[in-house]
């Protein structure tokens, strides 16, 4: 048992007097019950204003059997108010106010319903924040990603049908390059649509180690290059991913494999001459 806790459940056999809210207590609920053998007892739940030891609690509730609360606040309160063994009561004192449990699952569920940032739990759930702040940030990122993806809308363009027709047939060498020089053709919107509907991996380019580390074996890989990236396109990692074998040297060296990867590039420019063999590239004009 923890040496000092806030919330206690108690049983007091053969009580002689009613209980009242001590100044050190924040909330108290109890009722008179009859046990299986007919023993009359108080079954109760108490929340203290500060952490309290078992010795201190025994002074407040002489003769009571005390245990720290193991379930939720609501479960402990309900157990002290159950009807099946009730003789009299229940009696409540103080204000019952459910607070968030300092546990990772509870905090994650609260984040999902409230939209709070991890740092907002630093005071009320300090242990969880201290141990799992990175997990909470990652979880919030996934929530934000899901919310954003749900809002993405697509305005269909004819060239998109051509891309989907190409994807119907697997080709272990083909890289689909969607070329739209003017901008505004819907390239990025279509890339978002594929992320939303096909669990695609999306990248705007970068170093091989970073891209290989981020890629999680998705079978559809999308490169959506800004116009300013033309001189910095990493053609090597595009080809590695298409081959289904890519090496990541970020944090630790690892080789990732995938049986088949479809690669689609969206750009305002065509690939630089000589970077791919001619049979590699299928250009779709947006």
Swiss-Prot record:
UniProt-annotated location(s): Host nucleus
Cofactor(s) needed: Mg(2+); Mn(2+)
Function noted in UniProt: Essential for the replication of all genomic viral ssDNA (trans-replication). The closed circular ssDNA genome is first converted to a superhelical dsDNA. Rep binds a specific hairpin at the genome origin of replication. Introduces an endonucleolytic nick within the conserved sequence 5'-A[GT]TATTAC-3' in the intergenic region of the genome, thereby initiating the rolling circle replication (RCR). Following cleavage, binds covalently to the 5'-phosphate of DNA as a tyrosyl ester. The cleavage gives rise to a free 3'-OH that serves as a primer for the cellular DNA polymerase.
Gene3D superfamilies (UniProt xref): 3.40.1310.20
Designated name of the protein: Master replication protein
Family matches, as Pfam families: RNA_helicase (PF00910), Viral_Rep (PF02407)
Catalytic activity entry: ATP + H2O = ADP + phosphate + H(+)
Keyword Hydrolase annotated: yes
Enzyme Commission identifier(s): 2.7.7.-, 3.1.21.-, 3.6.1.-
Cofactor annotation comment: Divalent metal cations, possibly Mg(2+) or Mn(2+).
Domain of life where this protein originates: Viruses
UniProt motif (RCR-2) ranges: 41-43
InterPro entries assigned: CRESS_DNA_REP, Helicase_SF3_ssDNA/RNA_vir
Motif Nuclear localization signal per UniProt: ranges: 50-70, 96-102
Positions of short motif RCR-3: 79-82
Keywords in alphabetical order: ATP-binding, Covalent protein-DNA linkage, DNA replication, DNA-binding, Endonuclease, Helicase, Host nucleus, Hydrolase, Metal-binding, Multifunctional enzyme, Nuclease, Nucleotide-binding, Nucleotidyltransferase, Transferase
Note: The genome of nanoviruses is composed of six to eight segments. In addition, some isolates contain subviral DNAs.
Subunit organization: Homooligomer (Potential). Rep binds to repeated DNA motifs (iterons).
Signal peptide: none
UniProt entry tagged with the keyword Nucleotide-binding: yes
Domain CRESS-DNA virus Rep endonuclease: 2-96
GO MF annotation terms: ATP binding; ATP hydrolysis activity; DNA binding; endonuclease activity; metal ion binding; nucleotidyltransferase activity; RNA binding; RNA helicase activity
Family: Belongs to the nanoviridea/circoviridae replication-associated protein family.
Binding of a divalent metal cation, residues: 33, 41, 84
A single GO BP: DNA replication
PROSITE patterns: CRESS_DNA_REP
